């Protein structure tokens, strides 16, 4: 398994790993590679390119992307909440509430974008 960024899994520069455990059960869920300084530099370079690309999108296009993100959160609430539940050791209803809240925050930014353009 590699470090996931820019839409791809990339082999890490180093060989160190971290175990992801469920704090409620102690179960090891997965071992993930740790990024090293070289990985961090590559990730920052990709992030700068992504920012330039995102900045070139129109406000309505950005709003559409955020709305799609919110819809994907809502469509996949069960899977996302279960993953968060196992990763954080929280109860499932709390995790569902957090995913739902995240979708609502994204929708809120879409509504704010409409006001920036004078549309309501």
Please describe what each predicted stretch is.
Residues 1-120:
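N-terminal Rossmann-like NAD(P)+-binding subdomain of aldehyde/semialdehyde dehydrogenases
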């Amino acid at each position: 398994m590699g470090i996931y960024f820019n839409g791809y899994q990339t082999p890490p520069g180093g060989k160190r790993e971290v175990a992801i455990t469920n704090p409620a059960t102690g179960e090891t869920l997965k071992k993930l590679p740790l990024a090293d300084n070289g990985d961090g530099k590559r990730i920052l370079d990709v992030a700068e390119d992504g920012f330039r690309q995102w900045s070139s999108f129109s406000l309505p296009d950005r709003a559409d992307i955020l709305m799609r993100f919110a819809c994907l959160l809502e469509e996949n609430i069960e899977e996302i909440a279960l993953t968060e539940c196992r990763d954080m050791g929280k109860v499932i209803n709390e995790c569902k509430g957090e995913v739902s809240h995240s979708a609502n925050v994204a929708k809120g930014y879409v509504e704010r974008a409409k006001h920036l353009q004078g549309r309501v």
